[in-house]
Amino acid sequence: MGSLDSNYDTESPASVGQFNPLDPEEFRKQAHCIVDFIADYYKNIESYPVLSQVDPGYRHSRLGKNAPYRSEPFESILKDVQKDIIPGMTHWMSPNFFAHFPATVSSAAFVGEMLCTCFNSVGFNWLASPAATELEMVVIDWLANMLKLPKSFMFSGTGGGVLQGTTSEAILCTLIAASPMHFEIVGVKTSTSFVVYGSDQTHSTYAKACKLAGILPCNIRSIPTTADSNFSVSPLLLRRAIEADKAAGMVPLYICATVGTTSTTAIDPLSSLADVANDYGVWFHVDAAYAGSACICPEFRHYLDGIERADSLSLSPHKWLLSYLDCCCLWVKSPSLLVKALSTDPEYLKNQPSESKSVVDYKDWQVGTGRRFKALRLWFVMRSYGVANLQSHIRTDVQMAKMFEGFVKSDPRFEILVPRVFSLVCFRLNPISGSDPTGTEALNRKLLDWVNSTGRVYMTHTKVGGIYMLRFAVGATLTEKRHVSSAWKLIKEGADVLLKED
């Protein structure tokens, strides 16, 4: 795959006139081949090991050391994808992928992504692509309505939203927006006195975003959680931490709550945390990256109760709303704070619509300047499937997780460790109640390795409250009940093998 010849400058380049990187007819031909390739990939995806079986550094023997000097046939490149790339893939689209929260796919999002790539607009301001900007505003409000968010978060009200890449970016932007507010209101001279708060279950992206925002690592507070509260954060402990910091002369800046933590889908009490945030004048952000999508279903909406008192909310449709990575919605009540903190105004971007302040320039709502036309994906998904089908998709995943939970409960050798809320089941093999915790952990590590080594299923683990547990996350677009049943049979088979060895 690729040429090993590194003497690029010893040959004359091909005639410039022969090179056309965007020939419409050649594109049509190649695109047909790619669509067939992709359709066959999805059709045959169950034949691949879910977890890649290659060793680190496998590229050295397969992918070549240098880029080819001469062009290579499209057909040869596609063959190399099959031969060299797919073996190195962990197949997130596999119906037997039960590891991390999913990155969902759909035909509608795929078509939207194709158009996004086709237009290749760089929509940093309204004038650069009016359709990209205004369609994004539309789908942001559509999803807000689906979630029954208050008007204070919507363009049709007093707020607004933006499509970020990931939760990390969303949190980073709101942290940056919160800082100037405190510089002015509290009169802080330096960010070294800022303190931010989350729990020991808050996603690691929060700590990363805090560091990027200039928050000292020693000023990132992680409030401990316990099984008694199903690992949701305690407002009382949070209040005590803030009081201690204020007494030490520190300045509380930001609270990050979570609806659906990664380890166990714990749900923080938003209304009670909003009381704390209000009492101390700190920015209150809610991370609902995974579980927030479920709140388009009326039976799950109560998990967002209290969101009307938050300053910002982030949610990732690429996790559960069939919209492909990357797609993270960020809503803010005060867009002006975001714009003030992130805006740039170089002469070469000045234009009448921007100067009039009558349009949204999304470059001022994000870290970067350039941005893709990602709203097309969400627009196609929402229009192609409608709210009813998206709700059905989520409910089906939850029902399959409930089915798996029932399997676990029916086998006395296993136990459920935290209550299932959405489509994640946390469990472990514990054949002898009260057995040595170290031995139980070792047994479950072996079970996880045994299951994943088969290539037939891929799961992950977590450790919460000192307990090692297995995570079974249902959500891949192609997953059906038969895949869940087969996964359980494989897990039981692994347990049989390991317990016989003991």
Curated annotation (Swiss-Prot):
Its EC number is 4.1.1.105. GO terms for biological process: amino acid metabolic process; carboxylic acid metabolic process; indole alkaloid biosynthetic process. Highly expressed in apex. Expressed in young stem and bark tissues. Expressed at low levels in leaves, fruits and seeds. It comes from Camptotheca acuminata. Keywords: Decarboxylase, Lyase, Pyridoxal phosphate. It holds the Pfam family Pyridoxal_deC. It catalyses: L-tryptophan + H(+) = tryptamine + CO2. GO terms for molecular function: L-tryptophan decarboxylase activity; pyridoxal phosphate binding. Belongs to the group II decarboxylase family. SUPFAM superfamilies: PLP-dependent transferases (SSF53383). Residues 1-18 have a biased composition (Polar residues). This is Tryptophan decarboxylase TDC1.
